């Protein structure tokens, strides 16, 4: 195991009874000069997405742009206090169904509670159905999707538009969710309901959002099923926003 980040390690060593900051600060310190590391976790216990290798490759390229080292693994034993302390953020990339045991779940809860970042991509919402804490972290669980890829209009919030593109036409698999998360998160982007085949979310269909959770930062996008989407500059900029925010490089998700 590599040397852990001094900042996160110090926070994890603190009493869990200590109050967490409502707006978590970047998990770094003057004494910590190491390159920030991010774990991309890709374990699946259900459907396995073809986009996983492309997702890893894209995140590595984006990480290189902002000085973040990306480490990809399907090994759930990374989820213990000491190992998680070495990461600035953890990405759940297309994880499906139950991918962590009870002890690993508890370690991840402590990690986020002490300022660690979480970034979920697409099927990350198809995970952890028996883990209520995770359901709150990801924001909403997957419900259904129309068959095949859909050509839809995605509308970004004014201050969250990547590359200044508020209105974006995209072809991808579009999820409906079991609940609308808007009341509990900051919505980054929504699907135009008139361009979606099922319309199962009604007139308000969030597809990407962020929020703070128990001291950490959580960011999720429902896009990313189609490997071809990762070549789109708008989608890459969208992912980069999430990577920068969850690693504490940006105060705006």
Model-derived features: positions:
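Signal peptide processing junction and immediate N-terminal pro/mature segment
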Residues: 17-29
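Catalytic beta-strand/loop cores that center a nucleophilic Ser/Cys/Thr
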Residues: 140, 144-215
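Extracellular ligand-binding/catalytic regions of CAZymes and related secreted enzymes
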Residues: 31-36, 42, 50-53, 57, ...
């Amino acid at each position: 195991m590599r040397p852990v980040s001094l900042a996160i390690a110090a926070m994890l060593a603190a009493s869990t009874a200590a109050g967490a900051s409502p707006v978590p600060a970047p998990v770094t310190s003057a004494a910590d000069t190491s390159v920030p590391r991010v774990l991309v976790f890709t374990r699946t216990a259900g459907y396995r997405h073809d986009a996983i290798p492309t997702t890893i490759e894209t995140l590595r390229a984006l990480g290189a742009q902002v000085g973040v080292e990306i480490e990809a693994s399907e090994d759930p034993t990374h989820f213990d206090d000491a190992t998680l302390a070495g990461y600035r953020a953890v990405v759940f990339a297309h994880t499906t169904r139950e991918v962590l045991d009870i002890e690993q779940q508890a370690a991840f809860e402590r990690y986020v509670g002490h300022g660690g970042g979480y970034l979920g991509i697409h099927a990350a919402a198809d995970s952890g159905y028996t883990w209520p804490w995770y359901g709150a972290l990801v924001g909403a669980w997957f419900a259904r999707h129309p068959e095949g890829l859909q050509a839809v209009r995605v509308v970004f919030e004014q201050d969250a538009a990547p590359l200044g593109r508020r209105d974006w036409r995209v072809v991808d698999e579009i999820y409906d969710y079991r609940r609308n998360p808007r009341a509990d998160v900051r919505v980054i982007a929504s699907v135009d309901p008139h361009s979606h085949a099922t319309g199962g979310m009604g007139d308000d269909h969030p597809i990407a959002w962020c929020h703070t959770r128990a001291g950490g930062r959580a960011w999720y996008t429902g896009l990313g099923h189609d490997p071809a989407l990762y070549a789109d500059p708008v989608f890459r900029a969208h992912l980069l926003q999430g990577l920068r925010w969850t690693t504490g490089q940006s105060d705006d998700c």
